[in-house]
């Protein structure tokens, strides 16, 4: 028994040792398999396919920062700034960061922020709490640098600053309608700012950085340079623009008019040197400015040109041989289709010069009736009426031009003194620039161009020269535009007055007064159009309302540009047109 027991005990010990060895081997095998799996997984994630983890890490730490570029500067033809970008700051919040730091409290620093932004603390809290998990919300835009520095010193968690720019217009209301303005994101909304938005806008760059949990940049990954914006040099002369606006604004106030517009063009290049409207607005502070006050009336508003087309009627009659330079016309009132054609004052007869000087509707209508109906349509079109002005400005209109096949006699007659078509002030300025260049039609430009600008001849030079000389009589004693006369200079002008058309298409008891012309008449350099809309101070004729403005503006322009006086010296003989009938000074 004892021997058997002794043999069993070693056997059990051997089995127990074998069992422990087997479990140990199994455990080691499992550990090795786990290590192999972990090493394989690590190799897979770190070497074979690391993209997913890298992407996850980048999402948590990489940030793309925009490298902004300033909007291009707008200048006048001599480099004087008309629109510039000034550096400002945007204040923004990271709602998640604010909440992670304990949210908005009633502490002094949060109250200081609310006061600085002029936002009640409860409203500020509501805006940030509207999306607690959000990462971005603007609190204020275009904050001046001093205020931004103050907010930065508050060191509030989740409140950050971003660089941006704000547009500033040094000339303010003087160039408001032409230059326009931008919105808070520096996008052009009106005027040149909108029309040339792509040119003025640069391409922002990008900077990719790695940030730590506190938002600090710890590594620059890459960057893309921004592309600088283009500057824009306009054809405008800021000195002349200020002069035109000042005189126009004074005239609108003096005549209690609804509005006024004026356009000054360089005859030799077609460049627009000044373009003004009154009343204007302050583009640096648009608060309370109605949208209708922002339109550039020189390109958007149309009116019947009235007597300002009469020089073209005389040119056409001379070209077609209907009359000669020294012809005398019977200007006694007459009737057409039951309608009486008459002048403001009664004249028995007038020379061609007298027809322009006295602005005779009878005279030009008889010339028109002596020609085919297509004659005036063709001439007006040659000088640019009915054609787009193509400055590239938003809102430009081409006017309203008749496309008739058949014309009644009364339509032909009224067409000769500016009824039956509608033009913009800019279109009329182009007509007179063509007259001033003695029949050479040049495209208009709002940007600076380098001369020479050849243009296209649309009318014989000799005839246009003759009519320009006739137009000088309008500003001489006995003419309807004598109030436009400029001491020391000869000017060739035409005044006009037209009834306004109401919303229903009928004429109403309101008027538009205008004066258009060129100077100096001996060798024209500038063409100017002045339009006064609905004067209410008692006078409404162009000779009384717009002619004085023309004289004040053109006189200032000639002196500013150092144009040599060309008027006849005292003692030289000056030939005036003598007419039968009473004078009409100040009327037309």
Curated annotation (Swiss-Prot):
Primary location group: membrane
One GO-annotated biological process of the protein: FtsZ-dependent cytokinesis
GO cellular component: cell division site; divisome complex; plasma membrane
Result of altering residue 61 to F/P: Impairs recruitment of FtsN to the septal ring
Coiled coil: none
Domain remark in the UniProt entry: Contains an N-terminal membrane anchor-containing module, a central non-catalytic domain and a C-terminal penicillin-binding (PB) catalytic domain. The transmembrane region is essential for localization to the septal ring, interaction with FtsW and cell septation.
Protein name, UniProt field: Peptidoglycan D,D-transpeptidase FtsI
The gene coding this protein: ftsI
């Amino acid at each position: 028994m004892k021997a058997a027991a002794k043999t069993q005990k070693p056997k059990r010990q051997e089995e127990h040792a074998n069992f422990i060895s087997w479990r140990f081997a199994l455990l080691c095998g499992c550990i090795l398999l786990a290590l192999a799996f972990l090493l394989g997984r690590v190799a897979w994630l770190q070497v074979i396919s690391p993209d997913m983890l890298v992407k996850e890490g980048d999402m948590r730490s990489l940030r793309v920062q925009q490298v902004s570029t300033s909007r291009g500067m707008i200048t006048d033809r001599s480099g004087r700034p008309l629109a510039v970008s000034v550096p400002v700051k945007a204040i923004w919040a990271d709602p998640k960061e604010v909440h992670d730091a304990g949210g908005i409290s009633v502490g002094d620093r949060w109250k200081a922020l609310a006061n600085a932004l002029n936002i009640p603390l409860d409203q500020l809290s509501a805006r940030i709490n509207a999306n607690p998990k959000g990462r971005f919300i603007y609190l204020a835009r275009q904050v001046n640098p001093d205020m931004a520095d103050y907010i930065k010193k508050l060191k509030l968690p989740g409140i950050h600053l971003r660089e941006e720019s704000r547009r500033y217009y040094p000339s303010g209301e003087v160039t408001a309608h032409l230059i326009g303005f931008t919105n808070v994101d520096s996008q052009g909304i009106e005027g040149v700012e909108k029309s040339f938005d792509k040119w003025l806008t640069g391409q922002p760059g990008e900077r990719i950085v790695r940030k730590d949990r506190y938002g600090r940049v710890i590594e620059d990954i890459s960057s893309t340079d921004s592309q600088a914006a283009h500057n824009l040099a306009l054809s405008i002369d800021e000195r002349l623009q200020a002069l035109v606006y000042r005189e126009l604004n004074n005239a609108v106030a003096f005549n209690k008019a609804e509005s006024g517009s004026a356009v000054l063009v360089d005859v030799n290049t077609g460049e627009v040197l000044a373009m003004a409207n009154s009343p204007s607005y302050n583009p640096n502070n648009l608060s309370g400015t109605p949208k209708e006050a922002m339109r550039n009336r020189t390109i958007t508003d149309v009116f019947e040109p009235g007597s300002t087309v009469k020089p073209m009627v005389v040119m056409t009659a001379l070209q077609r041989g209907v009359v000669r330079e020294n012809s005398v016309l019977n200007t006694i009132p007459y009737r057409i289709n039951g309608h009486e054609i008459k002048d403001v004052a009664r004249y028995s007869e007038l020379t061609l010069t007298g027809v322009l000087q006295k602005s005779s509707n009878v005279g030009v209508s008889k010339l028109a009736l002596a020609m085919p109906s297509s004659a005036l349509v063709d001439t007006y079109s040659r000088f640019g009426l009915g054609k787009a002005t193509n400055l590239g400005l938003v809102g430009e209109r081409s006017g309203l031009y008749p496309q008739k096949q058949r014309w009644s006699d009364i339509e032909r007659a009224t067409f000769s003194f500016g009824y039956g078509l509608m033009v913009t002030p800019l279109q009329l300025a182009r007509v007179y620039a063509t007259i001033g260049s003695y029949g050479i039609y040049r495209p208009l430009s709002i940007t600076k161009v380098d001369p020479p600008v050849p243009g296209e001849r649309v009318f014989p030079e000799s005839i246009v020269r003759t009519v320009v000389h006739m137009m000088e009589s309008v500003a001489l004693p006995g003419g309807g535009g004598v109030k436009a006369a400029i001491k020391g200079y000869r000017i060739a002008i035409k005044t006009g007055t037209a009834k306004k058309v109401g919303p229903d298409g009928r004429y109403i008891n309101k008027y538009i007064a205008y004066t258009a012309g060129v100077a100096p008449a001996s060798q024209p350099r500038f063409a100017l159009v002045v339009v006064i809309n609905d004067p209410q101070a008692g006078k409404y004729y162009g000779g009384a309302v717009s002619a004085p403005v023309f004289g004040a503006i053109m006189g200032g322009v000639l002196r500013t540009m150092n144009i040599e006086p060309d008027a006849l010296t005292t003692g030289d003989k000056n030939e005036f047109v003598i007419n039968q009938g009473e004078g009409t000074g100040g009327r037309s």
